[in-house]
Curated annotation (Swiss-Prot):
Pfam families: THAP4_heme-bd. This is Ferric nitrobindin-like protein. It comes from the Bacteria. InterPro entries: Calycin (IPR012674), Nb(III)_bact/plant (IPR022939), Nitrobindin (IPR045165), THAP4-like_heme-bd (IPR014878). It comes from Cutibacterium acnes (strain DSM 16379 / KPA171202) (Propionibacterium acnes). SUPFAM superfamilies: Lipocalins (SSF50814). Belongs to the nitrobindin family. A motif (GXWXGXG) lies at residues 21-27.
Amino acid sequence: MPFQIPDDLNRDLMPLAWMIGHWEGEGHGNTPDDGEFSFGCQVDFTDNGGDYLHYICQTFTMNPDGTPAAPLRMETGFWRPNVDTRKVDVLMAAPEGWAEVWTGNIDGAKIELVTDAVARTEEALVPYTGGQRLYGQVEGDLLWTFDRATVDAPLQPYMWARLKRS
């Protein structure tokens, strides 16, 4: 699906313009406790005229016919790029009981992020401590990876997906 940069897009969002829209696809993951798994994924990057993008990512288990079966995880947040330095700050929160501050670099259609801070509740579902992410555009698709560390496990691949703009 072709993408056009909106005429009224805030100048500061130009480095992230390729991300704007609705993306869907499938991904895979791996945890030390549960092993390998597959999931469906929907990601939305939206613009309201400000100097940030709103982000929401929903993953879910899938029925045999490929339709969503049950929620797996969800996160939402804000992406705030600096057009002059090609850096980006990302704030995210998840209902599993944590909030994150990510920092990173924008290199064309590739964005690398690392956690600057992770705050979690006493009842957080996973003792998550930090991570790395990579977002990129390949052949028009959005590819992302999420490596995660916990109190019990060092940084390791956790989730990855390839999504198509829809």
